[in-house]
């Protein structure tokens, strides 16, 4: 497919691009689902595609890049127009050779590749910006504060579809990996159940499986396979329920605190390896653990620094030698501080001279996590599955829930807007992912049955 932009799209203004992106319901596919049209309002110098995909079991972005290289480049161009960026950067790992080979001959002036090392968490937005541009984002600040806007690969592809075809977000590409018969990466209708997604991979190969939504480091425990795929579903990771990654996620907060209080060795490795601390943020997990578990005096600013934790999980899964989870403790602190409407304003200190050498090699991470027996390539399958029912959650994004604009019994078509946020509210519209009939509407979701 050519990278040449149609004359109609070339003539679109920044406002017109953002409106098409809004109407298509594009949200950040790699994170919390921040509405893309709002992010594209920032006027910056650099538009950065975060293509690191540093969670070791996920294989989505690295395969979409070579499969849809031309569309990705055009998506970057549209985003650059919307943000006024003079430079576009696609940051990806050297091991993604097929993607590099596909993208390199397509790059126009003003767009370049930046090759990242195979380390974790290279895909942490703040780390990606630092490694790809040399700019450091201050604690609690947005990337736009240093002249950068960041989106991931799937988001940029959705931007291109929205601009060129006015095609709404009705599909999600995700990886099913781990203890499954046929690991794969597949594009599915939004609203398809995770149980059906698991079946596409031939089901679990262990008798008592546990499930993680996303990658092994930052993904959350899945409590029901009846949950639907959303715009932000990162993947489906299947492991024995006895695996430490599942068992840790099953620990309640009282247990997390009790373990920390009982076995902490005061070694401060969690801080020495904290990626945010390494690039100059005040965040010091070992001091926060002390403050919470041992009721030691701590400055208000130190406690507030918990709000800057990215929850990358290096402290728990790599650094701590005795099984403490500073990340879970930070998460508890963040919840309490946000309930009090607290905000952090702290300094950006000099980066640690050893920062680049203290990031975690992914091969070492796989071994450390006990994932070597379950690590699979998960090749991309181009055929899309057909489903008989979808459950479309009304809040698949940061901001207000969308409000249904259809009624039970109404016939809808794929791509039709079935819910939208109130005028002026932060959020994104929701679109039907199959042709069918609305069978149920609740405050949380719309159900569509094929027919």
Curated annotation (Swiss-Prot):
It comes from Salmonella typhimurium (strain LT2 / SGSC1412 / ATCC 700720). GO terms for molecular function: 4 iron, 4 sulfur cluster binding; electron transfer activity; FMN binding; metal ion binding. Monomeric when purified anaerobically, dimeric under aerobic conditions. Forms a complex with PduO. Interacts with PduT, probably via the N-terminus of PduS. It comes from the Bacteria. Disruption phenotype: Grows more slowly and to a lower cell density than wild-type. [4Fe-4S] cluster 2 binds at residues 309, 312, 315, 320. Optimum pH for cob(III)alamin reductase activity is pH 9.5, no major effect of pH was seen on cob(II)alamin reductase activity between pH 7-10. Pathway: Polyol metabolism; 1,2-propanediol degradation. This is Cobalamin reductase PduS. Residues 255-284, 300-330 form the 4Fe-4S ferredoxin-type domain. GO terms for cellular component: membrane; propanediol degradation polyhedral organelle.
């Amino acid at each position: 497919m050519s990278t040449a932009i149609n004359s109609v799209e070339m003539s679109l203004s920044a406002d017109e691009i953002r409106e098409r992106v809004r109407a298509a319901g594009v949200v950040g596919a790699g994170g919390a689902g921040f509405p893309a049209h709002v992010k594209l309002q920032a006027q910056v110098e650099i538009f950065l595609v975060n293509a690191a995909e540093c969670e070791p079991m996920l294989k989505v972005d690295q395969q979409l890049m070579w499969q849809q290289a031309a569309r990705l480049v055009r998506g970057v161009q549209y985003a650059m127009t919307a943000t006024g960026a003079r430079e576009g950067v696609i940051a990806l790992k050297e091991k993604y050779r097929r993607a590099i080979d596909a993208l390199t001959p397509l790059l126009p002036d003003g767009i370049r590749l930046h090759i990242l090392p195979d380390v974790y968490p290279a895909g942490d937005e703040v780390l990606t910006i630092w490694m790809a541009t040399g700019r450091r984002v201050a604690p609690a600040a947005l990337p736009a504060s240093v002249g950068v806007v960041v989106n991931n690969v799937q988001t940029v592809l959705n931007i291109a579809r929205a601009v060129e075809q006015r095609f709404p977000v009705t599909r999600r590409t995700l990886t099913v990996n781990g203890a499954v018969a046929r690991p794969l990466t597949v594009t599915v209708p939004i609203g398809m159940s995770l149980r059906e997604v698991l079946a596409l991979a031939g089901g679990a190969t262990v008798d008592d499986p546990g499930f993680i939504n996303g990658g092994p480091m930052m993904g959350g425990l899945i409590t029901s396979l009846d949950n639907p795929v959303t715009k932000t579903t990162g993947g489906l990771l299947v492991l024995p329920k006895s695996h430490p990654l599942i068992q840790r996620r099953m620990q309640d907060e009282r247990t997390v605190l009790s373990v920390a209080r009982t076995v902490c060795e005061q070694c401060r490795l969690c801080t020495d390896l904290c990626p945010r601390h390494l690039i100059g943020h005040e965040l010091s997990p070992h001091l926060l653990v002390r403050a919470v578990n041992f009721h030691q005096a701590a400055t208000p600013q130190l406690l507030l620094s918990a709000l800057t934790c990215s929850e990358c999980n290096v402290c728990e899964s790599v650094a701590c030698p005795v099984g403490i989870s500073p990340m879970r403790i930070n998460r508890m602190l963040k919840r309490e501080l946000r309930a009090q409407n607290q905000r952090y304003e702290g300094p950006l200190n000099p980066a640690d001279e050893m920062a680049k050498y203290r990031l975690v090699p992914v091969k070492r991470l796989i071994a450390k996590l006990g994932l070597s027996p379950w690590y699979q390539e998960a090749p991309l399958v181009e055929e899309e599955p057909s489903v008989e029912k979808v459950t479309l959650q009304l809040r698949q994004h940061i901001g207000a829930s969308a409000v249904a604009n259809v009624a039970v019994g109404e016939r809808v078509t794929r791509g039709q807007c079935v819910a939208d946020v109130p005028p002026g509210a932060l959020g994104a519209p929701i679109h039907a992912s199959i042709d069918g009939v609305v069978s149920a509407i609740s405050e949380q979701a719309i159900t569509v049955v094929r027919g």
